[in-house]
């Protein structure tokens, strides 16, 4: 760059700093690029698949899937992990369906959880913005986008047609929220539902679509698709669900990784079940017939007994987890490459 251009640029940068404050514009090389802070999800498999050890702070995350697939369970586990690390959590329950007893079973400290059950979508998003701007909340969950009903719809008649109202509300809210989220380093998780597209479908295109328009797809740094793929049985009794979680979008590490984990009724994600599955894959746990062995010790006949052994022996579980973390060490957060990866359906 010639001297005249350098002087002009320096003058422009000086004027910008004077008008908008120090740090409004900076050279990327002038600051140390630090790894993104993350909040663990409660699932070791998912933390590794996300590439940064959990859900990123200072970002928007969308978790979507069919009904009863484990969306709220996953967010409650993330809240529990955040609270264990001394963080503050807020839950905006637009569906008015949060069960505090179930949340407590998953490890959430319900006494310290900030809960809001707003009347309208505008109220929910305004409360979310105020909590984010306070800078004192580490994780904020909105459950769910589909339940964020615009005020005009609530005040109108039952059959009124108000096309695009919710999409406009979400678009406006996210424009306002994202800057505050980055500044306050808050993780904001939006839970979303699926709907079916009506009309002509292109071959190979999914008929499923998330609610609330397209804005959230663009603003989200991480999008997770969570689905129930089978039942977990103990004899004839169903004790949980086998669940597939796919990282559909990830701006911080390579996307499209997927994990199959277990969600047990009344317990949440089975940490011990994950350790066994990952241990077998990594050849740290040996499976001979129905028996599982770790090191010199047999830990159980059948997965349920092996799971019980690890639950009763937390030191053994911690040792196995440490070995697995060492083997599957998440790589450092890659630099964000924008929205041009073609990762939205």
Swiss-Prot record:
Give a yes or no for keyword Plastid in this entry.
no
Task: Provide an example Pfam family for this protein.
Answer: RecA_C
Q: Name one GO biological process term.
A: SOS response
Which parts of the sequence bind ATP?
65-72
Q: Where in the cell is it found?
A: Cytoplasm
Q: Name one GO cellular component term.
A: cytosol
Q: Report which superkingdom the organism of origin falls in.
A: Bacteria
Q: Which GO terms describe its molecular function?
A: ATP binding; ATP hydrolysis activity; ATP-dependent DNA damage sensor activity; damaged DNA binding; single-stranded DNA binding
Q: Which UniProt keywords apply?
A: ATP-binding, Cytoplasm, DNA damage, DNA recombination, DNA repair, DNA-binding, Nucleotide-binding, SOS response
- Keyword hit for DNA repair: yes
Principal place of residence: cytoplasm
* Cited function: Can catalyze the hydrolysis of ATP in the presence of single-stranded DNA, the ATP-dependent uptake of single-stranded DNA by duplex DNA, and the ATP-dependent hybridization of homologous single-stranded DNAs. It interacts with LexA causing its activation and leading to its autocatalytic cleavage.
- Protein family membership: Belongs to the RecA family.
Q: What is this protein called?
A: Protein RecA
Species in which this protein is naturally found = Stenotrophomonas maltophilia (strain R551-3)
Q: What is the lineage of its organism?
A: Bacteria, Pseudomonadati, Pseudomonadota, Gammaproteobacteria, Lysobacterales
